[in-house]
């Protein structure tokens, strides 16, 4: 099984998502975060399941519609490790901090 490492900024992404969910969907917000983390756990067994993105990055599509998110990650086969770099809502326009 592959190892999964979350970049420190992923915590900020999850905080932002949770804040948005509490504002718009209330009590159901924590279950969205559980769904996101459960989907990321799939990468332990299937690190190449995400669609190819730019360069050596991949995107894992999580859920759909209002519950839709995208996790940007890099799989390093030599280390058998998945590095999750960012998470955003499908309606968000890109990975802001990744575009520099």
Where are these regions (language model features)?
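Basic, Lys/Arg-enriched alpha-helical interface segments
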Residues: 1-59, 64, 78
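Enriched for short, Lys/Arg-rich terminal
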Residues: 21, 67-100
């Amino acid at each position: 099984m592959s190892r999964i490492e979350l970049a420190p900024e992923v915590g900020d992404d999850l905080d932002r998502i949770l804040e948005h969910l509490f504002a718009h969907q209330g009590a159901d917000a924590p279950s969205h975060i559980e769904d996101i983390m459960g989907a990321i756990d799939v990468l332990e067994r299937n690190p190449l399941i995400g669609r190819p993105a730019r360069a050596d990055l991949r995107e894992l599509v999580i859920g759909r519609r209002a519950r839709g998110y995208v996790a940007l990650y890099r799989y390093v086969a030599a280390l058998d490790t998945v590095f999750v770099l960012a998470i955003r809502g499908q309606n968000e326009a890109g990975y802001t901090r990744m575009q520099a």
